[in-house]
From Swiss-Prot:
This is Ribosome biogenesis GTPase A. One of its GO terms (biological process) is translation. Residues 14-178 form the CP-type G domain. Essential protein that is required for a late step of 50S ribosomal subunit assembly. Has GTPase activity that is stimulated by interaction with the immature 50S ribosome subunit. Binds to the 23S rRNA. Required for the association of ribosomal proteins rplP and rpmA with the large subunit. Interacts with ctc. Interacts with the immature 50S ribosome subunit. 2 molecules of rbgA bind to one 50S subunit. Keywords: Cytoplasm, GTP-binding, Hydrolase, Nucleotide-binding, Ribosome biogenesis, RNA-binding. Its main location: cytoplasm. It is found in: Cytoplasm. GO terms for cellular component: cytoplasm. GO terms for molecular function: GTP binding; GTPase activity; RNA binding. It comes from Bacillus pumilus (strain SAFR-032). Belongs to the TRAFAC class YlqF/YawG GTPase family. MTG1 subfamily.
Length: 282
Protein backbone atom coordinates (compact mmCIF):
# COMPACT_ATOMS: atom_id res chain seq x y z
CA UNK A 1 0.00 0.00 0.00
CA UNK A 2 1.81 3.12 -1.25
CA UNK A 3 0.19 6.26 0.14
CA UNK A 4 1.19 9.72 -1.03
CA UNK A 5 -0.39 12.67 0.75
CA UNK A 6 1.55 15.93 0.96
CA UNK A 7 -0.75 18.96 0.63
CA UNK A 8 0.86 22.22 -0.43
CA UNK A 9 0.46 23.80 3.02
CA UNK A 10 2.71 21.07 4.46
CA UNK A 11 5.57 21.90 2.08
CA UNK A 12 5.14 25.57 3.01
CA UNK A 13 5.09 24.65 6.72
CA UNK A 14 8.40 22.87 6.39
CA UNK A 15 10.01 25.99 4.92
CA UNK A 16 8.48 28.23 7.60
CA UNK A 17 9.51 25.92 10.46
CA UNK A 18 13.10 26.05 9.22
CA UNK A 19 12.94 29.88 9.17
CA UNK A 20 11.39 30.15 12.65
CA UNK A 21 13.86 27.79 14.37
CA UNK A 22 16.18 30.63 15.37
CA UNK A 23 13.38 32.04 17.56
CA UNK A 24 12.76 28.71 19.32
CA UNK A 25 14.21 27.46 22.63
CA UNK A 26 12.73 23.96 22.64
CA UNK A 27 10.73 21.65 20.39
CA UNK A 28 7.77 19.50 21.44
CA UNK A 29 7.52 16.62 19.02
CA UNK A 30 4.03 15.21 19.38
CA UNK A 31 3.55 11.56 18.45
CA UNK A 32 0.75 9.03 18.85
CA UNK A 33 1.62 6.75 21.80
CA UNK A 34 0.09 3.81 19.90
CA UNK A 35 2.60 4.24 17.06
CA UNK A 36 5.48 6.34 18.47
CA UNK A 37 7.86 5.68 15.58
CA UNK A 38 5.42 5.48 12.66
CA UNK A 39 3.84 8.79 13.75
CA UNK A 40 7.19 10.59 13.53
CA UNK A 41 8.10 12.32 10.31
CA UNK A 42 11.61 11.20 9.27
CA UNK A 43 12.22 14.75 7.97
CA UNK A 44 11.72 16.27 11.42
CA UNK A 45 15.20 15.37 12.75
CA UNK A 46 16.74 16.97 9.67
CA UNK A 47 14.55 20.10 10.00
CA UNK A 48 15.11 20.58 13.74
CA UNK A 49 18.89 20.20 13.71
CA UNK A 50 20.11 20.07 17.33
CA UNK A 51 17.35 21.95 19.14
CA UNK A 52 16.47 20.67 22.66
CA UNK A 53 13.42 18.44 22.40
CA UNK A 54 10.75 16.65 24.40
CA UNK A 55 8.91 13.70 22.85
CA UNK A 56 5.25 13.95 23.82
CA UNK A 57 3.55 10.55 23.54
CA UNK A 58 -0.04 11.70 23.11
CA UNK A 59 -3.22 9.61 23.34
CA UNK A 60 -1.43 7.58 26.04
CA UNK A 61 -4.84 6.47 27.35
CA UNK A 62 -5.39 4.57 24.07
CA UNK A 63 -1.96 2.88 24.17
CA UNK A 64 -0.78 -0.21 26.05
CA UNK A 65 0.82 1.33 29.19
CA UNK A 66 3.42 -1.45 29.43
CA UNK A 67 4.68 -0.73 25.91
CA UNK A 68 4.58 3.04 26.50
CA UNK A 69 7.10 2.53 29.33
CA UNK A 70 9.32 0.56 26.92
CA UNK A 71 9.20 3.46 24.46
CA UNK A 72 10.06 6.00 27.16
CA UNK A 73 13.07 3.89 28.19
CA UNK A 74 14.07 3.69 24.51
CA UNK A 75 13.97 7.48 24.05
CA UNK A 76 15.83 7.97 27.35
CA UNK A 77 18.64 5.74 26.02
CA UNK A 78 18.86 8.08 23.02
CA UNK A 79 19.20 11.06 25.34
CA UNK A 80 15.70 12.37 24.59
CA UNK A 81 13.23 13.23 27.34
CA UNK A 82 9.70 11.96 26.83
CA UNK A 83 6.33 12.39 28.53
CA UNK A 84 3.22 10.21 28.19
CA UNK A 85 0.26 12.57 27.91
CA UNK A 86 -3.41 12.77 27.03
CA UNK A 87 -4.28 16.15 25.56
CA UNK A 88 -8.02 15.48 25.88
CA UNK A 89 -8.20 15.01 29.67
CA UNK A 90 -4.95 16.81 30.53
CA UNK A 91 -3.00 13.81 31.83
CA UNK A 92 0.72 14.64 32.09
CA UNK A 93 0.41 18.19 30.76
CA UNK A 94 1.57 19.81 34.02
CA UNK A 95 4.98 18.17 33.46
CA UNK A 96 5.59 19.91 30.13
CA UNK A 97 6.60 23.35 31.47
CA UNK A 98 8.49 21.81 34.42
CA UNK A 99 10.51 19.52 32.14
CA UNK A 100 11.15 22.36 29.67
CA UNK A 101 12.55 24.52 32.47
CA UNK A 102 14.88 21.70 33.56
CA UNK A 103 16.19 21.21 30.02
CA UNK A 104 16.64 24.95 29.39
CA UNK A 105 18.01 25.91 32.82
CA UNK A 106 21.61 26.35 31.63
CA UNK A 107 20.57 28.45 28.63
CA UNK A 108 18.39 30.78 30.72
CA UNK A 109 21.06 31.02 33.44
CA UNK A 110 23.56 32.14 30.78
CA UNK A 111 21.09 34.71 29.46
CA UNK A 112 20.51 36.02 32.99
CA UNK A 113 24.27 36.27 33.61
CA UNK A 114 24.57 38.39 30.45
CA UNK A 115 21.86 40.72 31.74
CA UNK A 116 19.20 39.55 29.30
CA UNK A 117 15.72 40.31 30.61
CA UNK A 118 13.81 37.12 31.59
CA UNK A 119 11.21 36.05 29.03
CA UNK A 120 8.79 33.22 28.34
CA UNK A 121 10.08 29.93 26.94
CA UNK A 122 9.48 29.79 23.19
CA UNK A 123 8.46 26.33 22.07
CA UNK A 124 7.67 24.85 18.69
CA UNK A 125 5.03 22.13 18.58
CA UNK A 126 5.39 19.79 15.65
CA UNK A 127 3.90 16.49 14.52
CA UNK A 128 2.00 14.70 11.79
CA UNK A 129 -1.70 15.46 11.10
CA UNK A 130 -4.36 14.29 13.56
CA UNK A 131 -1.91 13.55 16.36
CA UNK A 132 -3.67 16.03 18.68
CA UNK A 133 -1.64 19.23 18.38
CA UNK A 134 -4.61 21.60 18.38
CA UNK A 135 -6.25 19.86 21.35
CA UNK A 136 -2.96 20.05 23.27
CA UNK A 137 -2.55 23.76 22.54
CA UNK A 138 -6.12 24.52 23.63
CA UNK A 139 -5.54 22.57 26.85
CA UNK A 140 -2.26 24.32 27.64
CA UNK A 141 -3.61 27.78 26.78
CA UNK A 142 -6.92 27.02 28.55
CA UNK A 143 -8.72 28.58 25.59
CA UNK A 144 -10.26 27.31 22.37
CA UNK A 145 -7.64 28.88 20.14
CA UNK A 146 -6.69 26.13 17.71
CA UNK A 147 -9.21 24.38 15.48
CA UNK A 148 -9.67 20.75 16.49
CA UNK A 149 -11.21 17.70 14.92
CA UNK A 150 -10.66 14.08 13.97
CA UNK A 151 -9.89 14.90 10.35
CA UNK A 152 -6.19 14.94 9.46
CA UNK A 153 -4.87 18.27 8.20
CA UNK A 154 -7.12 20.75 10.04
CA UNK A 155 -4.43 23.30 11.06
CA UNK A 156 -3.21 25.02 7.90
CA UNK A 157 -1.24 28.03 9.18
CA UNK A 158 1.26 28.81 11.93
CA UNK A 159 0.33 30.79 15.00
CA UNK A 160 1.89 31.84 18.33
CA UNK A 161 -0.13 30.94 21.43
CA UNK A 162 0.55 32.17 24.99
CA UNK A 163 0.59 29.56 27.77
CA UNK A 164 0.29 31.74 30.86
CA UNK A 165 3.34 33.93 31.41
CA UNK A 166 5.87 31.12 31.18
CA UNK A 167 5.59 29.85 27.63
CA UNK A 168 4.78 30.84 24.06
CA UNK A 169 3.93 28.03 21.65
CA UNK A 170 4.30 28.08 17.89
CA UNK A 171 1.79 25.72 16.33
CA UNK A 172 2.41 24.30 12.86
CA UNK A 173 0.25 22.39 10.41
CA UNK A 174 0.78 18.65 10.59
CA UNK A 175 3.82 17.80 8.51
CA UNK A 176 3.47 14.40 6.87
CA UNK A 177 6.16 12.94 4.64
CA UNK A 178 5.57 12.76 0.86
CA UNK A 179 5.20 8.97 0.77
CA UNK A 180 5.63 5.98 3.06
CA UNK A 181 8.49 3.72 1.99
CA UNK A 182 7.50 1.05 4.52
CA UNK A 183 4.05 -0.39 3.91
CA UNK A 184 3.60 -1.17 7.62
CA UNK A 185 4.10 2.50 8.51
CA UNK A 186 1.22 3.39 6.20
CA UNK A 187 -0.97 0.67 7.71
CA UNK A 188 -0.22 1.76 11.29
CA UNK A 189 -1.04 5.36 10.42
CA UNK A 190 -4.23 4.25 8.71
CA UNK A 191 -5.46 1.96 11.48
CA UNK A 192 -5.11 4.76 14.05
CA UNK A 193 -6.85 7.31 11.80
CA UNK A 194 -3.84 9.54 11.11
CA UNK A 195 -4.53 9.62 7.37
CA UNK A 196 -7.77 10.07 5.49
CA UNK A 197 -9.82 6.92 4.94
CA UNK A 198 -10.69 8.15 1.46
CA UNK A 199 -7.13 7.60 0.17
CA UNK A 200 -6.54 4.09 1.53
CA UNK A 201 -7.79 0.57 0.96
CA UNK A 202 -9.76 0.01 4.16
CA UNK A 203 -9.89 -3.76 3.72
CA UNK A 204 -6.06 -3.87 3.80
CA UNK A 205 -6.18 -1.84 7.01
CA UNK A 206 -8.75 -4.18 8.61
CA UNK A 207 -6.67 -7.24 7.66
CA UNK A 208 -3.57 -5.63 9.17
CA UNK A 209 -5.49 -4.81 12.37
CA UNK A 210 -6.86 -8.34 12.70
CA UNK A 211 -3.49 -10.01 12.15
CA UNK A 212 -1.87 -7.63 14.62
CA UNK A 213 -4.51 -8.50 17.23
CA UNK A 214 -4.10 -12.21 16.52
CA UNK A 215 -0.34 -12.01 17.12
CA UNK A 216 -0.34 -9.64 20.09
CA UNK A 217 -3.75 -9.64 21.79
CA UNK A 218 -5.46 -12.91 20.67
CA UNK A 219 -7.69 -13.26 23.74
CA UNK A 220 -9.10 -9.77 23.26
CA UNK A 221 -9.86 -10.58 19.62
CA UNK A 222 -11.66 -13.81 20.53
CA UNK A 223 -13.60 -12.16 23.32
CA UNK A 224 -14.75 -9.21 21.20
CA UNK A 225 -16.19 -11.37 18.42
CA UNK A 226 -17.11 -14.40 20.54
CA UNK A 227 -14.69 -16.70 18.68
CA UNK A 228 -13.60 -20.07 20.10
CA UNK A 229 -10.50 -19.96 17.90
CA UNK A 230 -9.01 -17.65 15.27
CA UNK A 231 -9.08 -19.01 11.69
CA UNK A 232 -5.68 -18.88 9.97
CA UNK A 233 -7.29 -17.94 6.67
CA UNK A 234 -8.08 -14.20 6.56
CA UNK A 235 -11.24 -14.67 4.47
CA UNK A 236 -12.52 -17.21 7.01
CA UNK A 237 -11.80 -14.80 9.85
CA UNK A 238 -13.72 -12.05 8.03
CA UNK A 239 -16.58 -14.49 7.45
CA UNK A 240 -16.66 -15.45 11.13
CA UNK A 241 -16.74 -11.81 12.27
CA UNK A 242 -19.27 -10.83 9.59
CA UNK A 243 -21.55 -13.67 10.65
CA UNK A 244 -21.25 -12.81 14.36
CA UNK A 245 -22.02 -9.17 13.62
CA UNK A 246 -24.91 -9.86 11.22
CA UNK A 247 -23.16 -8.35 8.20
CA UNK A 248 -25.10 -10.47 5.71
CA UNK A 249 -26.44 -9.67 2.26
CA UNK A 250 -29.19 -11.47 0.39
CA UNK A 251 -28.25 -15.07 -0.30
CA UNK A 252 -26.34 -15.24 2.99
CA UNK A 253 -23.17 -13.68 1.56
CA UNK A 254 -20.94 -11.66 3.89
CA UNK A 255 -20.94 -7.89 3.40
CA UNK A 256 -17.17 -7.34 3.52
CA UNK A 257 -17.42 -3.54 3.39
CA UNK A 258 -19.63 -3.46 6.47
CA UNK A 259 -17.43 -6.02 8.26
CA UNK A 260 -14.34 -3.94 7.43
CA UNK A 261 -16.01 -0.82 8.82
CA UNK A 262 -16.89 -2.60 12.09
CA UNK A 263 -13.36 -3.97 12.60
CA UNK A 264 -11.68 -0.59 12.02
CA UNK A 265 -14.21 1.24 14.20
CA UNK A 266 -13.73 -1.30 17.01
CA UNK A 267 -9.96 -0.79 16.91
CA UNK A 268 -10.16 3.01 16.83
CA UNK A 269 -12.76 3.22 19.62
CA UNK A 270 -10.78 0.95 21.95
CA UNK A 271 -13.23 -1.94 21.93
CA UNK A 272 -10.14 -4.16 22.27
CA UNK A 273 -8.75 -2.03 25.09
CA UNK A 274 -5.58 0.07 24.81
CA UNK A 275 -3.33 -1.08 21.95
CA UNK A 276 0.20 -0.21 20.84
CA UNK A 277 1.00 -1.24 17.27
CA UNK A 278 4.79 -1.20 17.43
CA UNK A 279 7.56 -1.80 19.96
CA UNK A 280 11.00 -0.16 20.08
CA UNK A 281 12.72 -3.20 18.53
CA UNK A 282 10.25 -3.28 15.60
Amino acid sequence: MTIQWFPGHMAKARREVTEKLKLIDIVFELTDARIPMSSRNPMIEEILQNKPKIMLLNKADKADPRVTKEWQAHFEQQGVRSLAINSVDGQGLNQIITTSKEILKEKFDRMKAKGVKPRAIRALIIGIPNVGKSTLINRLAKKNIAKTGDRPGITTSQQWVKVGKEMELLDTPGILWPKFEDEKVGLRLAVTGAIKDSIINLQDVAVYGLRFLEENYPERLKKRYDLTDIPEDTAELFDAIGTKRGCLMSGGFINYDKTTEIIIRDIRTEKFGPLTFEKPES
